[in-house]
Amino acid sequence: MLFFYNLKEFLKAFTLLSLVFAFILSLYSVLDVLLLYKTANLRIIPEAMLTTVLVSFYYTAPIINNLSLMLYLKRVFSKSYDKIASTFGISPLRFFAPILIFSLFLSLIQFALSYSFYPYIFKTAYSLEREFRKGKPQEELLLNDLWLSLNNAYIRIGFADLRNKKVHDILLVSLEEGYITELITAEEGYWEGENLRLKNAQINLFEKELQKQADVSIKFIPLEEAKAFGEKLNHLSMGRLISLYFLAGKIGMNRELYLAELLRRLVVSFSNVVILSPMLLALVRERAFLKPSTFLLIYGSIYIFSLNSVKIAAEEFGKNPLIGLVPFLVLSFICARSLYYLSKG
């Protein structure tokens, strides 16, 4: 009975704040469409509102969850329900178990939705902005200065427009026992299946001391996989990220980028429970809201810093993004410690 009462009261607070949050964002979205979009088409307003709310909720759910906790505890503390429960030997962990279970459930739901649902929402929001706000009807699938290793060869593509399958400024260097055996350069070419077709390529075969000019076909990777490399990472499903992680390793690309995006989704999803647990302990101990509010700012900052540090480690330094995960792991340790103290009362 106590379990369902606490769950009901917390869900009231969570629903109220979520609705307020959604209303403010919806209003912002409508004004954004009417005032800033080049094509103020009224039919896109519902879609723009929905994508804005969902994209924002994805990142701010941990904050809404903790604000809901504070709103819920205001009622609990005013009635001293937790103190009454403690006289019957009920620990804070047991008393607040419904809130912790809900937060864990919310984390799991967010993580499951980040497999393909949220990437679809991010892509839709991006497409709407490009088409109606910036007047660009299609997503650009461009690759610049791309270096790949394939078997015993290195391929450089200066520029590729994956929408029309064209590539420009191509260089291929074949090696054998550390020596260059073949050098192929071409100004332009195009993708055909798993092959790159190069027009009027300059071919140098050093072992045979032969130089010639001809059209060449190079076995490469399928265009669809190349398109994935040109897409924004948050538009890719988790399954695609995992496959690209292994593929990038085989062809010499920076595969850490794809691991970083997976870790970012993990951080966003499980921050719902990781931040709430130490906040709950601080609120129960203080039975006030000023000092715990400071903790919320600190934990929220660690959350944002973790998202950025994971990305920077992979993108800027080409390092394993697990290095950037350290702040979140520290926060996770604080979460586990908080649960222990809550169980002890």
Per-range role (PLM):
Residues M1-W147, E231-G345:
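Transmembrane alpha-helices
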Residues R43, E47, S103-E207:
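Non-transmembrane, extracytosolic/lumenal segments of membrane-associated proteins
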Residues Y58, D215-H235:
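Short, non-transmembrane cytosolic segments of multipass membrane proteins
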